[in-house]
């Protein structure tokens, strides 16, 4: 079998432990752009959302939004898993590791925000719990779980 060409981003190097000197300015620039876009869930004002949720949306619109939020709340967990277990362990370039580390933080904030929105809008505990566990309880999201499980099995074969 022919050998695979070396990928600099995957090649271990002692340089990966120190950020400077920057060796990949384009990757560093992407990290800095991501850093500049930082926000927190607490910065989002939800004070008017309940009124709008109850009075401005139809039942169909609420149903759609609930399921979109449930899908994203569940899917972000899969994204986080891949970033933290795959990308952070495979990638060796410090600029890329900084970017992925920051992306993990952003994904955590997104996950918190989707969950906070569900927690804010859905008053019924049983329905809210069902939506929080969408990856197990909603057929569309079950496909995400099955894809994740297949990915985990493939990873073990490497």
UniProtKB/Swiss-Prot annotation:
Give the signal sequence positions.
Answer: none
- The lineage's top-level taxon is Eukaryota
Task: Give the molecular function GO annotations.
Answer: oxidoreductase activity
Q: Which PROSITE patterns match?
A: RIBORED_SMALL
Biological process (GO) annotations? deoxyribonucleotide biosynthetic process
Family of this protein: Belongs to the ribonucleoside diphosphate reductase small chain family.
Its name, as the record gives it, is Putative ribonucleoside-diphosphate reductase small chain B
Q: Which organism is it from?
A: Arabidopsis thaliana (Mouse-ear cress)
